[in-house]
């Protein structure tokens, strides 16, 4: 379409956001191949996935394998973890960010062939977590639901993408427009078309250099209005953009 876009994290010099990194980078958030498990009331342990390493999931909850949790303040029992996404019909959504099935993969500018291969690895990582739940935590009666997705592997059609290209829109909506909307030079709150009410919540736990990134777990923000100009590209007519591709800063995208 010819729409210009940004990828990754802008520096605080670019966006004037005090919690942004000092330098811009192309790092995006982890994605997740969510799994829906069903209780079959019998042992339904899957075949061990290729390259399975239980230590990758060791501190997803409190268990004997977890000796040095990276997030000691966010540790729960296996039962609390598994019921986090409890659904009707004895099903469980597995979308667990703490050493679970989050997976770092920047496929935004990959070819179709490269994406297909990379996404198979992401699927395999989720299967590894399912196998860990079954063999290390004792949930061997839970396995991929056979009546949720019409796919051969019983996984969703696509992963949960937390980040994509963000267009250069008529306006760029930053954290400052949320935290102090009436103090900005551009009164974007006057053009709001939708209301948001969720904290800044970034997933970077599977990125190998996560220690160098800002900690953006549930950074509090007030309710906010989303301006119309974030949906409209700056230089292309007759196009409206939605979801993760609107014109916001990386911080706000989270």
Name each region found by the language model.
Residues 2-253:
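Flavin (FAD/FMN)-binding glycine-rich loop and adjacent Rossmann-like elements that form
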């Amino acid at each position: 379409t010819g729409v210009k876009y940004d990828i990754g994290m802008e520096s605080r010099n670019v966006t004037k956001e005090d919690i942004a990194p000092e330098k811009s980078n192309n790092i995006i958030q982890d994605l997740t191949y969510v799994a829906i498990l069903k209780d079959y009331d019998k042992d339904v342990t899957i075949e061990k996935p290729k390259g399975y390493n239980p230590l990758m999931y060791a501190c997803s909850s409190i268990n004997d394998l977890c000796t040095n949790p990276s997030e000691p303040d966010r540790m729960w029992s296996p039962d609390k973890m598994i019921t986090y996404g409890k659904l009707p019909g004895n099903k469980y959504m597995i979308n667990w960010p703490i050493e679970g099935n989050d997976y770092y993969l920047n496929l935004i500018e990959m070819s179709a062939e490269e994406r297909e291969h990379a996404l198979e690895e992401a699927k395999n990582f989720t299967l590894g977590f399912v196998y860990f739940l079954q063999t290390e935590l004792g949930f061997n009666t839970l396995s991929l639901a056979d009546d949720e997705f019409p796919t051969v592997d019983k996984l969703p059609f696509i992963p949960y993408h937390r980040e994509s290209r963000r267009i250069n829109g008529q306006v760029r909506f930053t954290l400052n427009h949320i935290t102090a909307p009436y103090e900005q030079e551009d009164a974007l709150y006057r053009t709001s078309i939708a209301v948001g009410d969720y904290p800044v919540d970034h997933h970077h736990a599977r990125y190998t250099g996560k220690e160098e990134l800002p900690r953006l777990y549930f950074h509090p923000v007030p309710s906010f209005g989303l301006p119309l100009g974030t949906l409209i590209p700056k230089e292309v007519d007759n196009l409206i953009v939605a979801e993760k591709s609107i014109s916001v800063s990386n911080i706000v995208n989270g």
